[in-house]
């Protein structure tokens, strides 16, 4: 959530930055905001005036009673009662205004950092760097590559079974390919915990609405979530605050560890990681990536979260991006790093890097990780603070990133390590997790 003081101080600048995002008119109704702010100021000024009058009258009442001027004292008491009634009404309206402002701000995305490229869609994203084991360009396989579907189905990917069990955009894995998927997740966790200093966490796969509000998925993106229904058809409706949702990413539970907490500065940075399934409705994705595992309702991901001092968050962003890159480099997978433009960033991000892995069958790069600095945007919603050197409570900065999406990494391994006979060479770093197995073959 944006700092309302920033909007009050320089609304025009904030609006100008918001207008660089996609569909800015959907974020903030400037006229409605200004009207509420004007009414708030009027009420507060009137409240101060009435409080001053009440204090003066209260003093007069004591003096009048002391002089025996009972009628005048009673008249002053009547004025005080009238002022109290008006103050009570003003307080009620002020609470309503504050609530309306909070609801309005909950729908407003984060302000882009000044270093973010300006643009309306992914065509304006800027390539930062690229990497390949053979130099900057991916090597040619020397034959026409198969995609992961044609490669994977003989090896144990079963899309038909996924449809049978759950519907479209679900996948079943069996045998060696299921083991390879598990090996990737274990390898990623080991890299992040043993080499990069993250604490491994096991978290619930369902969370409450407060958790999703804290990280920004609610209220604006409820349509992207899977709600967990309680009871049967005759069960009573679930109150909003008791509704549970399947996690869209373990960023949600991990970041909510610090909700309503005040940390010691010495505890920063907190570096957390978890391997979980993620559940997304993929609303608005009809017709996109319908073949294979690229866009699924359920997929596994190893998530990285850092809770940091505000002065350190952009250093942490670069560090976390390198942590995600390290996994790709150890796997020998060609990739590029993209700085997302203002129109392509997520709701809570101030700056985002996407890592895109090379898929030979598509002859293109596809997203495999997103690493974002949310600055204080989530922390303000979460009331996540630390006690600074001056002894004052200050909002932390939060960052999150994929380290990596396991299913998409499996896709990349299948396609980049395929052989002309349809077998797949297992990357050397994964072989200890595969009992020494060097290839997947029918």
UniProtKB/Swiss-Prot annotation:
InterPro entries: aa-tRNA-synt_IIb (IPR002314), aa-tRNA-synth_II (IPR006195), aa-tRNA-synth_II/BPL/LPL (IPR045864), Ser-tRNA-ligase_type_1 (IPR002317), Ser-tRNA-synth_1_N (IPR015866), SerRS_1_N_sf (IPR042103), SerRS_core (IPR033729), tRNA-bd_arm (IPR010978). CDD domains: SerRS_core. Its main location: cytoplasm. GO terms for biological process: selenocysteine biosynthetic process; seryl-tRNA aminoacylation. ATP binds at residues 280-282, 367-370. L-serine binds at residues 249-251, 303, 402. The keyword Nuclease does not apply. It catalyses: tRNA(Ser) + L-serine + ATP = L-seryl-tRNA(Ser) + AMP + diphosphate + H(+); tRNA(Sec) + L-serine + ATP = L-seryl-tRNA(Sec) + AMP + diphosphate + H(+). SUPFAM superfamilies: Class II aaRS and biotin synthetases, tRNA-binding arm. Keywords: Aminoacyl-tRNA synthetase, ATP-binding, Cytoplasm, Ligase, Nucleotide-binding, Protein biosynthesis. Pathway: Aminoacyl-tRNA biosynthesis; selenocysteinyl-tRNA(Sec) biosynthesis; L-seryl-tRNA(Sec) from L-serine and tRNA(Sec): step 1/1. It is found in: Cytoplasm. The keyword Lyase does not apply. Belongs to the class-II aminoacyl-tRNA synthetase family. Type-1 seryl-tRNA synthetase subfamily. Homodimer. The tRNA molecule binds across the dimer. Consists of two distinct domains, a catalytic core and a N-terminal extension that is involved in tRNA binding. PANTHER family: SERINE--TRNA LIGASE (PTHR43697:SF1), SERYL-TRNA SYNTHETASE (PTHR43697). This is Serine--tRNA ligase. It comes from Acidovorax sp. (strain JS42).
